[in-house]
Amino acid sequence: MGGNQSQPNATAIIGTGKGGPLDTSAGTIASRGISFTYDHAAEPALRDITLTVPAGECIVLCGASGCGKTSYTRVANGLIPSFFHGAFAGNQTTCGLDVETVPIDRLTPLVGSVFQNPKTQYFNANVTDELAFPAENIGLPAEDINRRITAVAERFGIGHLLHRSIFHLSGGQKQRIAVAAATMLGPRLVVLDEPTSNLDANAIADMRAMIEQMKDEGLTIVIAEHRLAWLNGVADRYVVFDGGHIVQDYEADEFLSLSPGCVAAMGLRALDLQPYRRRIAALASSPAADECTSALLGTHNLTIGYKGKDGFTRAIPDLRFRAGEITGLMGNNGCGKTTLVRTLTGLIKPVSGRIELNGVPAKPRDLTRAGFLIMQDVNYQLFSDSVREELLIGLDETDAGITAQANQVMADLDLAAFAERHPMSLSGGQKQRVAIGSALMCGKDLIIFDEPTSGLDRYHMEQVGELLRQLASQGKAILVVTHDEELAAGWCDRIVNLGADDSGNNGSHVSNPDASSPSPNASTNFATTSTHERNAQ
């Protein structure tokens, strides 16, 4: 591991033991009149932000996509203006240091950052190496690094993940490793940007436990987040952004007492998921859909998975997906949801059984031609240099009708302003909408969405729901893989709950539905239900 380079203040900054006793006197964020415009951007991302965060406090930054939450996290951790360049005004001190004048390596040991997509911050393929990386970077001796790895693993309960390949971890496990790595240097401040956007209920519970642990140790915590319900009882303050401004700064009790209507009017996600969970539980106790109705796609004695020594397999009860119907596929990470949709779209072959299209046995290539899959990580399927070109891939750009359709899709998805922007320059939520736009342009009969509302605010989540309904009304069969209980309760006609078995293994066990389960995402049952009601209340 790394050698002992000259770092005179490293020991004082980092402490001892499990991160050491924290000197929280410098763990304050102070922003005074902060404004920032990214290079080549027409409008400021932040406008006259004044905010103070006392040491040891946990604050939540919330608001619609593009409101300035992520930009402010970059100011708080010093990435603006040292890494993201543009016009910066105001005064920002983080952990007692002026971010405009202090070298970024002075801030590094004091601030831990966790980004929305943990893949963007990994430097190693092995969990242990990833945890060691921050300490190696500042030249700590190998003995100290090993001690820190042991302490962090014990603190966050991740000892069983040490030495494993990061590529073999679930989304929740990857995010836990990212948080653990961010605390390796004993920071005074931890900044998290939408840490639960891709997580299921169990993984969110793990994330909450990590936040509580850090808060108990006296760390200052800043979380930019759309999904708010999981933070009840953890956050001390909620700061609402809009158009680059801070429009409200609530104490937790005041914020949690707001009516659902007031929360919705601010464009925020629900603070209480119980009405949505009751809705899904009610669906889980409803009769199955009419089996006499013809299905666009059906499965018979299907087993999905991967062959080999460490292969995953799962038996799937017979399913039917009908034109004009929105089916929600729910369940914990690792239960086989993504494997199932890849099988249904012909990307991988089933282990056994068959899949039918319009009652006729289908080969994988037939399924590929019939369906369109929007992947969970849309970065893998964005290829063009502009949003407009992305929507027109494979289509005749000289056809006025197709061009008009693309313009309408961009307008419907609130993407018209980004028509000439490179897709990779957009936010996570905007990229999701570009991929949804591609699905609307493809004209196929089966459209499968893998976590389409990941990273989306309330307005755009509801917009996705409306688009799903629009597609269904056009006779499309829609399958939505989702952890989003608001989306599932409000917009799905049927729910398929695909959970792990009672022993926690993701195998072939299927049990009867338990309608009393408080959280459909945390259920260990498999249930299919049907309804045409979409009132989450």
State where each predicted segment sits:
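H-loop/switch region of ABC-family ATPase nucleotide-binding domains
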Residues: 225-226, 482-483
